Amino acid sequence: MDNFNVVANEDNQVNDVKPPPPPPRVCARCDSDNTKFCYYNNYSEFQPRYFCKNCRRYWTHGGALRNVPIGGSSRAKRTRINQPSVAQMVSVGIQPGSHKPFFNVQENNDFVGSFGASSSSFVAAVGNRFSSLSHIHGGMVTNVHPTQTFRPNHRLAFHNGSFEQDYYDVGSDNLLVNQQVGGYVDNHNGYHMNQVDQYNWNQSFNNAMNMNYNNASTSGRMHPSHLEKGGP
């Protein structure tokens, strides 16, 4: 058994040993000795393949020579054309100055100014239903800054009474100016009133207020407590 293993090991060692390379040969085409061994063609020791460094061509020893031009085995170098990459094309197409934000500082100021003017005109139109805005804290409503926010239920005195105005998020895209005078106006976009109806409503309201004021003043003058007592 031991002898069998020794024989097997010797056979494996013999099989693992690679055959020595063949001796250098002269090029079969140009007769140059500047050659090198490459490999065995089809794993056969009888077909060693060589490469000639002089004419840059391969040949197999003992095989037929093909009609290969000088340097035909090497690939010709292709000239590269410097083409811009996709990233460069995108960067050139999109310049830093061409991209503008939706609102820059100047446009934002212009927008706020125009929006403030529209909101002020709307508040002035609502205020005209009751009286001139000069009686309402010296025109405070007309000078509303578009980005200023008031607390809800901000009371403004009006003659002998008062009315409430609620401002929510003045200066945002959705202006909510709620007027609590017998009802709420949720949005100035929903406030539509004919000029003729508004004028008639103002006249009737002013007449009613004047009548109430005259009656109150007349009854106060005619009250017995206001009569001066005469006599000795």
Swiss-Prot record:
GO-annotated cellular components: nucleus
Zinc fingers, Dof-type class: 25-79
Domain of life: Eukaryota
GO molecular function: DNA-binding transcription factor activity; sequence-specific DNA binding; zinc ion binding
Coiled coil: none
Residues annotated to bind Zn(2+): 27, 30, 52, 55
GO biological process: regulation of DNA-templated transcription
Keywords: DNA-binding, Metal-binding, Nucleus, Transcription, Transcription regulation, Zinc, Zinc-finger
Intracellular or extracellular location(s): Nucleus
Signal peptide: none
PANTHER family in the record: DOF ZINC FINGER PROTEIN DOF1.4-RELATED, DOF ZINC FINGER PROTEIN DOF4.2-RELATED
Summary of the function given for this chain in its UniProt record: Transcription factor that binds specifically to a 5'-AA[AG]G-3' consensus core sequence.
Protein name per the record: Dof zinc finger protein DOF4.3
Gene that this sequence comes from: DOF4.3
